[in-house]
Amino acid sequence: MAELTTIARPYAKAAFDVAVEHNAVDTWAEMLTFAALVSENETMQPLLTGSLASTKLAALFISVCGEQINEQGQNLIKVMAENGRLKVLPAVSELFAQYRNEWAKEVEADVVSAAELSSEQKQQISISLEKRLARKVKLNCSTDAALIAGVIIKAGDLVIDGSVRGKLSRLSEKLQS
């Protein structure tokens, strides 16, 4: 994955710079998300790794995307096809989203809890994270009964493990040392 990120970074940065310059960050985010979905399609995958000429591949990809991709987005697709990089579109989309969130002073936080969180609990977590990170926080909540109780929160580089499973694991490590 690190290699894909390295390959995708210049494309994501260039797309983001163009998006900011043209005040079209949300439009670009939607285009890249759609293009990433197309590139991940099981019918499209063999074409991306096959021996199809880059101009034909770009034309095919653009025709599949249709009106979802504007002229600037089509130019990005053409350049990526020419360099054999269409398979990294999901990584480009992901990096673009990170650049967008950083630019908008937003962060996505993954919250995994043992049981479904109430709206009040979600609001408390969101407020606490916004204070700690000095950013607007968007929560992605999920459940995992294996946590036993508590939550695990991941927001950027920050990881807070308040789960019983995590506490038991840390206790076990201390006892073994």
UniProtKB/Swiss-Prot annotation:
One of its GO terms (molecular function) is proton-transporting ATP synthase activity, rotational mechanism. It comes from the Bacteria. The keyword Cell inner membrane applies. InterPro entries: ATP_synth_OSCP/delta_N_sf, ATPase_OSCP/d_CS, ATPase_OSCP/dsu. GO terms for cellular component: plasma membrane; proton-transporting ATP synthase complex. It is found in: Cell inner membrane. Keywords: ATP synthesis, Cell inner membrane, Cell membrane, CF(1), Hydrogen ion transport, Ion transport, Membrane, Transport. It holds the Pfam family OSCP. PROSITE patterns: ATPASE_DELTA. It is a peripheral membrane protein. F(1)F(0) ATP synthase produces ATP from ADP in the presence of a proton or sodium gradient. F-type ATPases consist of two structural domains, F(1) containing the extramembraneous catalytic core and F(0) containing the membrane proton channel, linked together by a central stalk and a peripheral stalk. During catalysis, ATP synthesis in the catalytic domain of F(1) is coupled via a rotary mechanism of the central stalk subunits to proton translocation. F-type ATPases have 2 components, F(1) - the catalytic core - and F(0) - the membrane proton channel. F(1) has five subunits: alpha(3), beta(3), gamma(1), delta(1), epsilon(1). F(0) has three main subunits: a(1), b(2) and c(10-14). The alpha and beta chains form an alternating ring which encloses part of the gamma chain. F(1) is attached to F(0) by a central stalk formed by the gamma and epsilon chains, while a peripheral stalk is formed by the delta and b chains. Belongs to the ATPase delta chain family. This is ATP synthase subunit delta. It comes from Shewanella sp. (strain MR-4).
